[in-house]
Amino acid sequence: MLQPKRTKFRKRHKGRNRGLANGTDVHFGTFGIKAVDRGQMTARQIEAARRTITRAIKRQGQVWIRVYPDTPVTEKPLEVRMGNGKGNVEYWVSKIQPGKVLYEIDGVPEEAAREAFALATSKLPLRTTFVTKTVM
């Protein structure tokens, strides 16, 4: 699963998921899926969607993951009283803003790409839309 090899600090403030997205255009592939909602994706969700896409296109073409889980999320164990410090890092998330391209595909027909992305979207916690590369 995706997670940083090393970070300057182990734990991070929760923060707020506001603002505009970077990476709003299909850059590497021909087709992609773009987030419509604001939210966060865990490393497990990113990997599950990647596997679904790879299997749906039968390992043809190429897949790019445009999001990376770089924010640690901590949790305290069950039945532990409040206080006594911040909990342990349990998983990593990527904060997603509307318009962010999540995955890209190249080397497959459009219909196969649409089908693969439709299957992958069911694994994700936010709504997405299908986008194609615009050539100027």
Curated annotation (Swiss-Prot):
Organism: Buchnera aphidicola subsp. Acyrthosiphon kondoi
Key word rRNA-binding present: yes
Complex and partners: Part of the 50S ribosomal subunit.
Disordered, as annotated region: 1-21
Domain of life: Bacteria
Assigned GO CC terms: cytosolic large ribosomal subunit
Primary role: Binds 23S rRNA and is also seen to make contacts with the A and possibly P site tRNAs.
Family: Belongs to the universal ribosomal protein uL16 family.
InterPro entries documented for this protein: Ribosomal_uL16, Ribosomal_uL16_bact-type, Ribosomal_uL16_CS, Ribosomal_uL16_dom, Ribosomal_uL16_sf
NCBIfam families registered for this protein in UniProt: rplP_bact (TIGR01164)
GO annotation terms (biological process): translation
Protein name: Large ribosomal subunit protein uL16
Biased composition (Basic residues): 1-17
Keywords, comma-separated and alphabetical: Ribonucleoprotein, Ribosomal protein, RNA-binding, rRNA-binding, tRNA-binding
One annotated GO molecular function: tRNA binding
UniProt cross-references to Pfam families, sorted A to Z: Ribosomal_L16
